[in-house]
């Protein structure tokens, strides 16, 4: 600081240098130093000074000190005005608000020093604090916010600028740091101000929340963006209001009415290209005439905002016409449209309620697309009519799309040049200005071009455009029709006249024409006034001398809400007004009605009305005479006519079909097909379906005594008994234990309706009991009354047993010829194959085939059957339990039929009680001794030691497995097993039950060597038996076992390895029963099909893995899966018994005694109690259409739980397989009838059906196989990121599906195999992509199995190849369209839908305004109906930042943790196209006020949380069209029940499937 100046004059005046601090008054005056301002003495002194300060001296100096207004703060600089003493605002040592603001802002990155500016106003001082932050994108333009307390209770009125600075700083501190308790550090004064601001914040409204943001710059950017949006919405609302439209602004209807929820505001908009919409409408009209039943089906559509009173269907002709008209017009419909809908509805109701009504009344139902509306509520029916028949541009705003899906540049103009481009723009002008259909205008221009070429004439561009309008007018009036007018009125006449205008019209006439047209325009201006005659802008003109005559319009002299103008056009070669005798065509003025507010069809209707006054039934002679004379003056007449009628026509518009009938073809115009009340009523779904009709009208031929047949059968029996080969076979049969019990068995059957036979393995019950019954009947002369059906649980069992019985009776079934010898008594029938003669009396079949015969097979009471023998009844699968239930009911209806139940391990008491204490008989077995070898025995005897390579990297650990291993060791030690063997058994047991193929191969090799040694030593008979039977759980395991055996067994030429499972053909299955060549040993590797019924006669050794695949329900996926688990002890006993049929045998069990005793259940749990019941429900409904399924299944041997039945009902209704109107009595839908024929999980079956009909069968076979197999990708914990990237590499652009990515991986593997890549290359590829080779093989096997099901039901042609490249046009036309594939996946998985919640948009400020910040993938949230869920990191969609749709469908869910910490993860997700939801989702619910469509549960009265779970913004017309397409799809499926392959040939079916496919390909957008 500079030294203070010493000059006395300066000192006395108080003047100092600019660098020196000013002198206080008490120094200059030489008085005592005043006390500090915050002391009591200072305050008393201020009071006294204020009271005495009243006089002012003449020199301008005060007579006494002025009151203290401001002073320096504690440690603060600055002062008051001149002559005022400085004041301390805060106690010494206080931290001032200003300093606190500087310090805290300085710590914030990028923030600049605050600018604190005091501002003076009338009441004192206020303060504004400006904050700035560095803008990294534009350093010269930092982000800026300003804080100034303007709230009434917080406004500053400080006495000094310094005080204002501190209080302003306090305000700024609170705005930024209100979440902190800074008031504790503030001095008195600002501290109380802080508390005051806290109180204000608590009571502040929610819209002021932005004020308390810790980052004011971000809050300001967001607020600016919201303000800009509101301004745009306000302008949009004003624009809509000016056009008389209704729009939704700020979540309200025109800024008023009820507010919309956040879900509706954020819903995605569905867009439908107008070209696609027209195609859909044309397809619906054509297809409804082919499928009239679809028109009568209930419309799967309701209105969400519909009142309860109006929701009920009205079947009477009584309609509140006035009230309904008022309601419809309140929605914005024109009064004429509303009246038309009410008139139609009234006629439709009369026609339906009175079948004898006149044909005129019945004509109300001329369009079958609307027949169903007659059974809807009044408003709903009227709205459907209006949605379908009101031109889209004339719909109220809430009912039509807000945006267009068409491209601005059409294909006709893209890349065009020269004349083509000029024609394109001319077409646009005529379409937009006159409202003419684009296709019709294009057709006229083609006619003009053809005429030019033919006559070698080239017209000027303006002439061609004017001529096109003149030709369109004549065509629209109908004068081109021979029955409508003379030749001179046609468009061809005017075309010819204009082409030859230069040669046929002389110069004088040309000049006269020009003069008359000019005079006429002057007359119009003189009569109407210059303000009503307007020249349109250049780009709107249709000719060179166009002018508009205003008829009505807001803001004009004539006024009116609608814009109506008559445009008069001319061109250089126009004929008007030329007399008729001077031209070959009638010379009319070229005119049209133009408007900014009217829809195109109303503009055309007004124009058409004026045209018809020249010619036809409505001809006005004065107009006609004026045209004939060529005097002109017709324009004023047109204006007068238009003025008198335009408002009436707009209020009550004509039908669109009458306006467009001459402009468009019949496919585009509204065509109709007449329907009568009788045809409509007959087609209603309340009538019996074809299946029900078959049940009632069908019926097998009842058994009758036929002496001729009896005699023939006895002759055959004698011939059999006298044949040379019979004696040996008879000897074999008599040696079976069943033969000694034959008399007792037959006696029980004769005297009882139901008999239970428990026969030990090998007793011969399966082959002999049916023959006992047949032989007795034939011998008694009653063979004609004997017809036996024997059911087997598997196809291979039915074939094997039938073949054996045929041999015993001297017949042959195992040949390659499909036909059997006439008169053969033994045959078999399996799904897709039947080998039996017409005289067959002993038919072996699968359980499912007999169930279908009971259902839709035409013999519901089995009147043509005398005995039903159910074999292996102990297995308790769903089909066998269902068959028992059906047979128990059948016994009441059919008094003659007999039922025999057989099994080796049957629980006699359970079955006897179920069938009313039916008698039981037991037959002892005839088997040789079988020696058991458990795992510990095998290891000890063979010396096998596991290498450890098989389980490396996959051995399971943990407390549970270690505890089990400890118990196993104790069990082994109790048997006296040595330590080395214990360790080997423990090592093999650590796999958790997984099969060791190294062990399996070694055991088979050991058995082969052991058998050879025994046979060489004579310990075993080498001529009898010696075959080895290996039991594996599934087809994939069979393949691996064969590989292991092939590798292990020495001298492979000495063994023949054969697989055996249900997927093999009948010929392949027969090979296992045939003997092998001398010196060779047969090894059969089989699933549990060889466990019962089938007897491979030469088996002496059984190798049992102890594993089986059971159908179980997985809660996390909700899918039926085949789960590998331990077999039951009863099943293993059956397997063991296979070894002792022909000689002493041995059973090698690849599991320990500990597993046998502790892990295996005694009996298998009935399948009906452990699997989902959807398939069973479908089967029951296909057989008993109106049955209460719950009540019926409660009669089963072991009824399923109520919870599982409720779940099945819900799932079937949601899947669209079951109607929802009658609960457990509801009928099957068309889709449900197809699903009932597929013995698959509901979702897989639906996926395959939909994939077939929509041309993507190949990919869906793969996807369905992936769903039913173990995961395709192996994900090691330590390489999760690499595995996820590998899976994502298969997700092609537009795929957006985990399942399709997996399918792409499988297809690449198939391609590598087709290219004959080496096993090493394929293995390396799999390892590099973390793909399981066993899963790939399983998927391939499953594809073949699934395809066979579709081919057996006739849905897919037999020549379709499962190994193709998706090039079959019938079934794979859409295989490359990701939109169709994702839609079909949604169809199969609905209602497993998850909502995507993208975070609210955030904005950054820039020099050009605010810019939206890109969202991060981790900010995207997902919600199902129960709350928030999470996408699994392995999903290919996990890193997606944005989605085209707002919904995903997921195949599986998994949960981690428990309680509040648990998270639900989604797996196998697929993004869902919006139209897929509309076409394949739940019930559609139109919300007119929200301008959207909700998609909820298919169930009536479903859970509230399921209602409108999916919300889409779309106009009601889209909802109605989608509902109509749904009904047509049902009709196509219904048609395909009898002729499934006709879907692709019948035009109606093909058109419906094609148009739906086109919609799904681009999600409603034009191609």
Curated annotation (Swiss-Prot):
Q: What is the lineage of its organism?
A: Eukaryota, Fungi, Dikarya, Basidiomycota, Ustilaginomycotina
Helicase ATP-binding domain ranges (all copies): 746-924
Motif DEAH box at which residues?
Answer: 871-874
Tell me which family the UniProt entry assigns to this protein: Belongs to the DEAD box helicase family. DEAH subfamily.
Q: Which organism is it from?
A: Mycosarcoma maydis
Binding residue positions for ATP:
759-766
Among Gene3D superfamilies, the record links this protein to: 1.20.120.1080, P-loop containing nucleotide triphosphate hydrolases
Could you tell me where the Polar residues compositional bias lies? 10-20, 670-687, 713-726
UniProt-listed Enzyme Commission number(s): 3.6.4.-
Keyword check for Nucleotide-binding, yes or no: yes
For this protein, the record's SUPFAM superfamilies field holds:
P-loop containing nucleoside triphosphate hydrolases (SSF52540)
UniProt KW keywords: ATP-binding, Helicase, Hydrolase, Nucleotide-binding
Helicase C-terminal domain location: 1003-1184
Q: Where is the composition biased (Gly residues)?
A: 74-83
| PROSITE patterns per UniProt | DEAH_ATP_HELICASE, HELICASE_ATP_BIND_1, HELICASE_CTER
| Protein name, as recorded | Putative DEAH-box ATP-dependent helicase UM11114
SMART domains for the chain: DEXDc (SM00487), HA2 (SM00847), HELICc (SM00490)
- Root EC class: hydrolase
Q: Which GO terms describe its molecular function?
A: ATP binding; helicase activity; hydrolase activity; RNA binding
According to the UniProt entry, the coiled-coil residues are: none
